[in-house]
Amino acid sequence: MKLSLSCIVAISTAATSSLAFVPSNTRTSIASRTTTSCVTSNVKKTSTLIQMSDTVEEIETAPPGINTELLGRPSRPGRPLKVAIAGGGVGGLSTALCMLKKGFDVTVYEKTAAFARFGGPIQFASNALSVLKEIDEVLFDRIMEKFTFTGTRVCGIKDGLRADGSFRMTNDSLDYLWNPEAPADWFVKFPLKACADLFGLPYTGVIDRPDLQAILIDECKKIKPDFIQNGNAVNGYVSKGKGQGVTVNLEDGSTAEADVLVGSDGIWSAVRAQMYGEEQRKTSADGKKRQGCNYSGYTVFAGETTLKTDDYYETGYKVYIGPQRYFVTSDVGGGRIQWYAFFAFPPGTKKAPSGWGGSERNDQADPEENLVEYIKSLHQGWSSEVMTVLDSTPPESVEQRDLFDRSPELLRSWADGNVVCIGDAVHPMMPNLGQGGCQAIEDAYVLSETLELCKSTENLEGALQDFYKKRIVRVSIVQLLSRLASDLIINAFDTPWSPHDDLGKSWKSYLTFFWKPVLQYAIFPAQFAYLYSYHPTGSMGGLPAELEAKWQEQHVKDSEAAFDRVEEDGQSVAAPSFFKTAEQPATIMSAKKN
């Protein structure tokens, strides 16, 4: 389409700088009004492209297939903010969707060659669900269709040695102190539902990571079909100075230009490595330090099984505590139970294969070793509940990962010029609170809101520093709480004292016993109330209860069908399913019941 010279002059005058941009809620720009007066109504789409382009030449070569919904949104003088995102994980995709919905021009650079179904379930607490709903109603509704609620059921801590009938630590009564027939109960229950109800938020639960990523990718493609470039990771950047943007260096040797680079490329981030002058993936001789991370002191084994336990529908997740280790189980939907076994082992104590992070894949140390039997041997004398879960798990599906984390970056900003890091790149977390993905989603939302307030690229550096200041206190608290949970369970807790047996007689056992009321009535309520206190939607009224009721019926149907299938065909588990990468296709295995 050709425009008259007077129209071009008018448009150029309206867009005083090709680098200027305003929030997406600005209604009608000068350029829009001027263009409308110069062209007929049948070129409305082109007039919007003019406002979003740097030059008239760009108008005639605008990429086909751009979503008309985006073009119909309130206009920006000049052009949209151009954002490059390193990494197409949960944090990167959430950031992309947030920014695309605000009219930014976003490209995600992802190392994997193509999207594939990989990775295990991910927990979303009430705070993250509030953010997801605020980002997009359709996104939230689609996630709820794939969601499994755990926070509406009993969740908490059990004694790993007494949790099958002899446990005397009831929540609401002191009968266990003198009555050996007092019913077995939980050591501590988590107030997940009560804290969610306090703020009127959806309840904590899980969703399979592949389902989540597929939904995020689909919602992004509705706005910009070619928003993601697969098979081309970010491996560095060159800052061009204030207001001049950043050159993004890609793995294939090419470069890309952007106003902002977001490093969402995980714990071994290449963007972070350059920002902080770290040698990427460099590991110390003793294995305890790696690219600014410290070995947490814990290794974790993971597995999944389809199993109908006696309390399957009544419990969400359980943490079994014992000397120098703990064992976690969670309902993850469709009759499946996901489990994690944490041990205080030195780094490099590798037994099982792992594909976590894309660089730590290795074969099983001893292919002939039965990993389930190995883990059972480390839980001698533990509850039959733990043994039943392990016995039903195909040994081939077991995986392992050494856990690394970082101290909060209180003295170093997450931003360098027009480059910023989010998620695990700057605040990796121990998995105990299930807040790793949640905090990455909070990052995505806050960063997008902060950048939307900018009116010029000259202000971007300050905006990124503002983002860091907005997030550092909350993220640091959550990081410390996550680490403290592991340290307490492993180093301070032991089998609780009971007057009815000799299982817990050490000083740690007495300490654990006296921790019970403090944890139940003070620490855990305060902890979860703080986590859920960030909820941009505000209260959702009766919606959380409606969602849970709708899910409950379907959950029973799906689970019973899975139990019937296992009864007939045995366990069928995709492995690796937790820590694998897209380059490593899943292998389906079956373990027929005897």
Residue ranges and their predicted role:
Residues 230-246:
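A conserved short coil-to-beta-strand element within the FAD-binding core of flavoproteins
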Residues 164-204, 208-211, 252-256, 289-294, ...:
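Conserved FAD/dinucleotide-binding core of flavoprotein oxidoreductases
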Residues 85-88, 92-101, 262-263, 268, ...:
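Conserved mid-domain beta->alpha element of the FAD-binding
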Residues 5-12, 21-27, 33, 38-83, ...:
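Extreme N-terminal leader/targeting segments of oxidoreductases
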Residues 208-211, 218, 268-315:
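Central beta-strand plus flanking loop segment that forms part of the substrate or channel wall
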Residues 118-219, 489:
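Active-site-adjacent segment of FAD-dependent monooxygenases/related oxidoreductases
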Residues 56-84, 143-145, 155-177, 181, ...:
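C-terminal helical "tail/cap" subdomain of flavin- and related membrane-associated enzymes
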Residues 100-120:
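Glycine-rich FAD pyrophosphate-binding loop
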